[in-house]
């Protein structure tokens, strides 16, 4: 299993769009499900047991604004258009299911978030 794209969850069948940061695997990327919902995903934690990600649903207009440097990454998560993001815990054990839960933007902690004024600059080809 790819440790950054959960399978069989309420997020749907996800396909990678672009990678913006990479460290052993994509750390910051965009993806989209088959019905067209786009997400900006950020790797926030890792352990021997699981990797934890934040997935912010974004409209296509907002996605363009993010890619064009009009919205910083912290704002993507703290002011999601629907006021929530998904926390996705993906187990390292391929036999276990990913756990997805909705989090209100106001409940995110600073250690889960990018620093202020960080923007997507370029996509990385992998």
Language-model features, listed with the residues they occupy:
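Amphipathic, interaction-prone secondary-structure segments
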Residues: 10-46
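Short, surface-exposed terminal/edge motifs of secreted or surface/virion proteins that either
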Residues: 37-64
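Low-complexity intrinsically disordered segments
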Residues: 54-126
